[in-house]
C-alpha cells in the first residue's frame, strides 16, 4: 500500500465515523473492513471505573465488535453520541505510517464551533492483502 493509499485509507476510516447517511456509512464500512473484520476498543478509564462500580469485571477488559452489523452499530453509536448534534467532528492527524500490513495514526475530535481539540486517540489497523481492515485497535485518550 503506497503512501497515498495509506492516506486515503486513513481519511476514509476517520470519515466513516462522521458519516451522516446511514446507507453510505454501511457501504463504506463494507468497503473498508473485511467481512469478519474486528474493532477493539481500549475503554477510557472513566468507563472502566463506572463498570467496575456496577459490579462488572471490566477493569482491564477490551470491547470488541466483529462483522459488518456490529461494526455498523459501533460506528453509528459513536456518530450519534459525538457528531450528529453538530458539536464535534473527527479528523485525522497527519502522522499515518505503514509497516507491512499495519497502519498507525492518530485522530482528533474537535469542536466544530472553535476548532479546539477536545479529544482524540491512537488507531492501529491491520489490513489484508486487498487493503481491507481485519483488525482495528482504538486507543482513545
Description of each model-found segment:
Residues 1-141:
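C-terminal and inter-domain tail/linker signature
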Amino acid at each position: 500500500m503506497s503512501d497515498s493509499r495509506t492516506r486515503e485509507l486513513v481519511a476514509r476510516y476517520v470519515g466513516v465515523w462522521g458519516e451522516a447517511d446511514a446507507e453510505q456509512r454501511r457501504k463504506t464500512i463494507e468497503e473498508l473492513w473485511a467481512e469478519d473484520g474486528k474493532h477493539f476498543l481500549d475503554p477510557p478509564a472513566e468507563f472502566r471505573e463506572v463498570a467496575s462500580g456496577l459490579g462488572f469485571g471490566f477493569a482491564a477488559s477490551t470491547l470488541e465488535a466483529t462483522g459488518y452489523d456490529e461494526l455498523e452499530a459501533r460506528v453509528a453509536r459513536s456518530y450519534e453520541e459525538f457528531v450528529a448534534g453538530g458539536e464535534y467532528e473527527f479528523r485525522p492527524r497527519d502522522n499515518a505510517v505503514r509497516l507491512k500490513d499495519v497502519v498507525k495514526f492518530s485522530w482528533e475530535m474537535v469542536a466544530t464551533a472553535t476548532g479546539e481539540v477536545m479529544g482524540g486517540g491512537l488507531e492501529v489497523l491491520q489490513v489484508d492483502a486487498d487493503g481491507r481492515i481485519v483488525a482495528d485497535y482504538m486507543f482513545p485518550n
